[in-house]
From Swiss-Prot:
InterPro entries: Ribosomal_eL37/eL43 (IPR011331), Ribosomal_eL43 (IPR002674), Ribosomal_protein_eL43 (IPR050522), Ribosomal_zn-bd (IPR011332). Its cofactor is Zn(2+). One of its GO terms (molecular function) is structural constituent of ribosome. The keyword Amino-acid biosynthesis does not apply. SUPFAM superfamilies: Zn-binding ribosomal proteins. This is Large ribosomal subunit protein eL43. Pfam families: Ribosomal_L37ae. Keywords: Metal-binding, Ribonucleoprotein, Ribosomal protein, RNA-binding, rRNA-binding, Zinc, Zinc-finger. The keyword Transmembrane helix does not apply. Binds 1 zinc ion per subunit. Zn(2+) binds at residues 38, 41, 56, 59. GO terms for biological process: translation.
Length: 89
């Protein structure tokens, strides 16, 4: 019990909260539970340990990121700005 065809794991909420919310939860959780690329070894082996904590199962690298994604939009912007500043030097 707890799964449905349309909303997957968000089916655990049953008829509560409405379809839109349950679809959003299902979408976020499906991406969150996927394996992501490691920033150290570049393998698809990063799994979520806890809220904002991510660990690579191959190289053991542990790092912080977003609650649902290992890299947030803000992190991408900062990384791009740093890279650009280093190139200008």
């Amino acid at each position: 019990m707890g799964r449905t065809k349309k909303v997957g794991p968000a089916g655990r909420f049953g008829p509560r909260y409405g379809m839109r919310i349950r679809r959003r939860v299902a979408e976020i959780e499906s991406v969150q539970r996927q394996k992501h690329e490691c920033p150290v070894c570049h393998k698809r082996a990063v799994k979520r340990v806890g809220t904002g904590i991510w660990r690579c199962t191959k190289c053991g690298a542990e790092f912080t990121g977003g609650a649902y994604y290992p890299e947030t939009e803000a992190q991408r912007i900062v990384r791009r700005a740093i890279r650009k500043a280093l190139e200008e030097k």
